[in-house]
Amino acid sequence: MAQKHPSTSRSCASLRPNMESYILDELSARFGVGPSNGDPRSPHFSREGYLVASLFSKLPKSENTPEVRAQAALTKFLEADLRNARSNERLLFCEGYIHGKPISVILDRARSICASILGSGVDYRDVAMCGSFSGGASTSKKRGVSTAYFKFRELGDITERAMPYLERYVELTRYSELSDARGTLARVVPGNIFFTVPKNAETDRGACKEPDWNMFFQKGVGDYIRKRLKRVGCDLNDQTLNQRLARAGSIDGSLATIDLSAASDSNSISLIERIVPYELYAVLDDLRSPITRLPDGSDYTPNMFSSMGNGFTFELESLVFLSLTRAITSLFRVPGKVSVYGDDIIAPTDATPMLLDLLGYCGHRPNVDKSFTTGFFKESCGKHYFHGLDVTPVYVRRPLESRQNTFIQCRNRRGGAYTVKVPDRRRVIHLHNRLLHWGSLDGVVDPRLDGVIHELRSMIPEDFWGGRDVESIDAAVTPDLPRLRYHESFDRTDTSDEVVYLMCLNGSRTESTLVPKGAAFSEVATRRERKLCVSEITAGPGLLTSVTPRLQTRPNKTWLAKQ
């Protein structure tokens, strides 16, 4: 019988009582940084200080319960919509000036630019027919059963004004067969449903679950807008253009990076009507949700045109912001690059005073913490640069301890009992690997990270050492031998009608697999490979008669076959 391979890893890894405080204190001491070093606008800014200031900034605080964060997201959603109500009134008349230019003239130019991007002679009702279902949750289905299969197969939701689009879609496709069997096309609902997802330590992010068929047609229009934007150099499938421009702006200061606060919830109905050509606006207005159901069950009529969760919100806001930015640069004759990715805007530094005034008039507010119009620090699409150097920090977004077994009870040699926190292996591995990547810009790991790296590595069993991918959450990057994947192929060559049970002894655990006649069995071992020992391969009827290794490694497995 195979012997159990002794593990060299610690039997019980635990977290320090105040792991976050230890990491911050250790890094601050090793780097010699203080609070001022983490402020991008401070003359004492440094990459190391920025890491310390940002590392746990997105980790939810213990006193902020999920209910508190969800309520904060709802409050922010309603406050943004209150501003939309004022924007709707203001944009009806478009009175006032921005740096000597009438606002009405600027918005007319933006509308003209928007129309040129979209092209002419397009029937957007036909465009909506080219939609698709997403894998996200809807008003009728949870995320786990929200694939296209279930959304086509089961009865979906739709708003009343979007029903003509579904009727037309049924006429053009074979979906009519399924609808005839049901006797109805879809269930009519008033609108979408508000919900929240985790964002940072203070608040969640608000979004809305759209009716199934509304989302289907929304994505059709959104995909068309995305394709038209790509034709003019705004590729919403690629963030690297914004990132490259942000780096260029951090070198010479010629470009500004602007991030808008609650941008998806700040596109008022009047703004979209003022910027977007009527042919497209009419279709978008049919497909949007006119009513939002709040967590308390009440129905709310929003002043925003669409929210996050809508199938065309991202493309529509990109189109609007690109049109507004180009209107400013063309009317004020400011040269320079313009790029937009959602609410991340890159514009010439000289144009930012006028652009911010215009955005403010339209109901949008810049995120002060993430907008950099002066200086040499720039941030866009998740990348942060300072004088051309990548200073993007590492973020810990979830607690390092395991959620399933936060505490375990241990006993010391004297019989005393105590409890320790159990680390979440994947989160610890991810933090370990990301810190290694952050500290090795020149190919050599910063020795000042040694203390924290060794502390994190001590909480990772050695069976998960030897990784090579810094993005991995399953293997810690260490100098050890790589965690190779072992592949053995067992080919059955006899002609009997009997079946074969293949048993795998891995320590004290035994697994069995049924191998039918004429089939080949293969097993991939993902644990650290140790030793190859294939035993008791006995010839005879109904047995495996050949073993073909495909990769010569040292697996921590013992294989045997029996009748």
Regions found by a protein language model. Name each.
Residues R231-C234, P366-K370, T392-P393:
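Acidic/polar loop patches that form or flank catalytic/metal-binding clefts of enzymes
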Residues S9, E177-D180, P211, M215-Q218, ...:
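Nucleotide/phosphate-binding sheet-loop regions of phosphoryl- and nucleotidyl-transfer enzymes
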Residues G156-I158, Y165-E167, E171-T173, K219, ...:
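Surface-exposed, low-hydrophobicity interaction/linker segments
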Residues M1-D204, K421-Q563:
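C-terminal, non-catalytic extensions of nucleic-acid polymerases
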Residues H384-R398:
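A polyampholytic, Gly/Pro-enriched intrinsically disordered region
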Residues S250-Y341, I346-C362, D369-H384, S402-N405, ...:
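Conserved polymerase palm-domain catalytic core
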Residues R205-A207, F217-Q218, D265-S268, G388-L389:
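Short helix/loop capping segments that flank catalytic or ligand/cofactor-binding pockets
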Residues D204, C208-I258:
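Active-site-proximal segment of RNA-dependent polymerases
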